[in-house]
Amino acid sequence: MATHLSHPQRRPPLLRQAVKIRRRRVRDLQDPPPQATPEVQVQSHHFSPEERDLLYEEALYTVLHRLGQPEPNHVKEASELLCYLQEAFQVQPEEHQQMLQRVRELEKPIFCLKATVKQAKGILGKDVSGFSDPYCLLGIEQKVGVPEGSPVSRRRQKAVVRHTIPEEETHRTQVKTQTLNPVWDETFILEFEDITNASFHLDMWDLDTVESVRHKLGELTDLHGLRRIFKEARKDKGQDDFLGNVMLRLQDLRCREDQWFPLEPCTETYPDRGQCHLQFQFIHKRRATVASRSQPSYTVHFHLLQQLVSHEVTQHQAGGTSWGRIAESQAVTILFLHATQKDLSDFHQSMAQWLAYSRLYQSLEFPSSCLLHPITSIEYQWIQGRLKAEQREELATSFTSLLAYGLSLIRKFRSVFPLSVSDSPSRLQSLLRVLVQMCKMKAFGELCPDSAPLPQLVSEALRMGTVEWFHLMQQHHQPMVQGILEAGKALLSLVQDVMGDLYQCRRTWNKIFHNVLKIDLFTMAFLELQWLVAKRVQDHTAAVGDLVSPDVGESLFQLYVSLREFCQLGPSDSHEVLALDGFHRWFQSAIPSWLQRTYSVALERVQRAVQMDSLVPLGELTKHSTSAVDLSTCFAQISHTARQLDWPDPEEAFMITVKFVEDTCRLALVYCSLIKARARELSAVQKDQSQAADMLCVVVNNVERLRLIIDKLPTQLAWEALEQRVGAVLEQGQLQNTLHTQLQGALAGLGHEIRTGVRTLAEQLEVGIATHIQKLIDAKGSILPEDAILPLMKFLEVKLCYMNTNLVQENFSSLLTLLWTHTLTVLVEAAASHRNSSLASSRLKVALQNLEICFHAEGCGLPPEALHTDTFLALQSDLELQAASSRELIQKYFRSRIQQQAETTSERLGAVTVKASYRASEQKLHVELLSASSLLPLDSNGSSDPFVQLTLEPRHEFPELAPRETQKHKKELHPLFDETFEFLVPAEPCQKDGACLLLTVLDHDRLGADDLEGEAFLPLCRVPGLTGCVEPGEAPQMRLPLTYPAPNGDPILRLLESRKGDREAQAFVKLRRQRAKQASQHAPATEP
């Protein structure tokens, strides 16, 4: 079995075409440009004076001897037709009168009526069978001297043909047997002299043959047939039956008539006798004109048609309009009369029309679609045998002539059908369709058997035309001054024109040729042109050599870019090696010049942009200056140049990209130095420090915009695609180490410049913030904190609004971050130095709250996660405590102990079990102390003497309620108290934050102070019945683990202890210190 490697596969059509073109181009590249193909000789549509006179005579003769009524849309007046002929033939009035008189003196033609009896329907059935054997008698009666409407005339209208017309002038059709709808389709030529007194007569008869009665009885079908037998028995043997007649005055007929006429009776016996289909045409015999005597009728008609169409086309062109068909009623009338009088068949009329139009199309400008109708007519009626040898030759010549002319137009379609004219595509498409229809005709195939297939002829014409057009363009772009630079510019213009032509071929022309002829014009043109372009580009780059000047380098770069675009235009499905494959190697020596010029041009633009920059924002929404915009454009141009270059060789492409990145980063740092120097230069002449700050803001914004531009280099230079290309030729990570290292170094330098600028702006505000915070603290005590903070907030509002207006969002956010960090530092220092002043702490607390709102700015400033730093949270907590009163601090202390109680699960110190409920009706807090368990042995005997002290805390909320105690249990670590206590207390203080029942378990000591077993805190807000109006039921038991105070002290206690002048605070701290001391003496070994 043969495999796909056994034999080479057949090449696709596109590949075969490319191979053929390449072979031809090898010869073409070595030979001089081919000579232009000789132009097709077009026959003139003008007649000689003698031919024109004969044709004019023929036209006048046709009008003067017109017969019949005019057609509905035809011209009635002969004078109007004569005037039109005089204009169409451009005959002077005197000459016209002379020729008209001469034509009138010519012998009249023999007038004839061409009558065709087509068929009849619904005639009477005269035979016994119910049918008839009809035939017709017809002729023309000349009425001489009989006035219209006289009795004789009326009688003659009732007369039959055999009684009124001589037998030699009578014509008879064939007999159609046994039918009521006979079909004859027979034509007769009937001559007459005077149309005004002539009438056409047609009688229809039923042929009667002698038959026996027995035979007729055999055909009998009904009573009507029986009556027919009796009637025939009375008449003469062999007498025919009259079926009806048609009588028409010739002067009432049109030049051509085709209709159904009713059969009239001689008597009123049977008024409805059916209809007869007749066709009439008035024709001439023996016309006296020279043209009619010497030339075939269709030739004369063809020449007349050519003359009239030529006149109409010329008239339309003079009026600036396009001719589409014969629209003048005079021309239509004359041509109709001539074809009718000459008795031209439809086929010969179509042939004459084709000969005239195909010849005129080659010399006059009118739509080729006019040729489709005669082509269709000839194809529909084509029968080769009907044409004589000279007619076949004439038709074949017209085919070959139009084909040659059409191919010459197709070869030059770029100039003949320019796209600057809107209807050019439709005109070309119409021409192609005409050629296709013509070559598909049976007549063309029989008369032009040796003609090559039309697609082959058109393809060759397009190929030759493409080559001719290229050489024409090359001559057009030939420089006046010879030199390398001028030659490069000329070659660049040539390549751009070639690409423009290919774009037009692909966008417009290719669809037309492909739809009509299945020809891929674009591919053929591309394959032809790329060989021609490649030769000239290779010769030019060889002439340039290795020493490339800047101007020549720029010209070569533009040529390189154009060639890249040219190659991208090529068909994507072509696998053929093209002449332009690897063309980049021809430009390899120009790469250093291109890179150096790119950097030099960019550096000049950067320097010029900075020098022209006044460091003023471009607008309210645009906060950078002109140099930033110019720099962005400059870097975009560098990226565009890199994309245009797109060097195919991977390793060289990597080195080129490294150079582009290096130059871009260098330009960025150069810009930073230049823009800072420009700011110092402008600030030196400014006396207002605010203007210097404005310039600094603009500089920072410009550098930030530059940083964003540099950050997009990987995308703009397509690093990912480059990394895929160079993966096979570079070491792993080499691209990352080289390009990304360059980029990160540049970004780091720009980031440092931005931070330096923002830090400078922040330093100008930090002094003001510290000053206003100090004034806030030093304000009089009578000033509320909300009022004391106003100067600071107004200062920040003004300054931050200014910075927000002049800085881009990224830099403004950086500034806010620096200011927020500095502000927190100032507040922490102030809070630490005024720790003992609740007033100062209150003001600092209000300041922190307002500053948080200010720096957040409803989402337009710093986000919450940036504001709520560890320093902020610690400061917020400290100020919350420092600003609180002593009683508020005591409440916070008990709230923290309640929280500690809720989080404690270990019972290392023991636990107490209680029940608590509140009776709102009695305003009593009912407490049942049930038991304690697992107490620590604090006595030397290994046991304890426990009792529990019950107090409602904080004391300032329950000043009238004295502490309660349980009984003391001797030597018991698990005492059962089972004691009940009631506290008369309103519900309101019990519901406050920090309100609790403090259960202090003590070990009774007879000799000294009681020892602390532990504390338990029952929050009153959890007591059943306190929040509802319904009396509580059975209160649930609550088991509370015992806890110790914090061994390292409590910040709240330390804060209270610092308030020396507050006796309540000092008493509370003293008690809590005592409890902490007791706890430290008996803490378990595992307690930290």
Curated annotation (Swiss-Prot):
User: Does Oxidoreductase show up as a keyword for this record?
Assistant: no
Task: Supply one GO molecular-function term.
Answer: small GTPase binding
Q: Per UniProt, where does Ca(2+) 1 bind?
A: 127, 133, 206, 208
Q: Identify the InterPro entries for this entry.
A: C2_dom, C2_domain_sf, MUN_dom, Munc13_1, Munc13_dom-2, UNC-13_domain
- The UniProt record lists the MHD1 domain at 557-675
User: Where would one find the signal peptide in this protein?
Assistant: none
Domain MHD2 stretches: 786-893
| Keyword field contains Repeat | yes
Q: Which SUPFAM superfamilies does the annotation name?
A: C2 domain (Calcium/lipid-binding domain, CaLB)
Listed as disulfide-bonded, the cysteine pairs are none
Q: Which UniProt keywords apply?
A: Calcium, Cytoplasm, Endosome, Exocytosis, Lysosome, Membrane, Metal-binding, Phosphoprotein, Repeat
Cofactor names from the entry are: Ca(2+)
Which positions bear Phosphoserine? 150
Give the residue ranges for region: Interaction with RAB27A. 240-543
Tissue pattern of expression reads: Expressed in lung bronchial epithelium goblet/mucous cells. Also expressed in spleen and testis. Expressed at very low levels in heart muscle, kidney, liver, brain and skeletal muscle.
Q: Which portions of the sequence form the region Disordered?
A: 26-46
Q: Which residues form the C2 domain?
A: 92-239, 908-1033
Q: Which SMART domains match?
A: C2
Subcellular location(s) per record = Cytoplasm; Membrane; Late endosome; Recycling endosome
GO CC terms = exocytic vesicle; late endosome; lysosome; membrane; recycling endosome; Weibel-Palade body
- What remark about domains does the record contain? The MHD1 and MHD2 domains mediate localization on recycling endosomes and lysosome.
Assembly, per entry: Interacts with RAB27A and DOC2A. Interacts with RhoG; the interaction increases RhoG affinity to the membrane lipids, targets Unc13d to membrane lipids and facilitates cytotoxic granule (CG) docking to the plasma membrane.
Q: What does this protein do?
A: Plays a role in cytotoxic granule exocytosis in lymphocytes. Required for both granule maturation and granule docking and priming at the immunologic synapse. Regulates assembly of recycling and late endosomal structures, leading to the formation of an endosomal exocytic compartment that fuses with perforin-containing granules at the immunologic synapse and licences them for exocytosis. Regulates Ca(2+)-dependent secretory lysosome exocytosis in mast cells.
User: Which PANTHER family does this one have?
Assistant: PROTEIN UNC-13 HOMOLOG D, UNC-13-4A, ISOFORM B
Name this protein carries in UniProt: Protein unc-13 homolog D
Can you name the source organism? Rattus norvegicus (Rat)
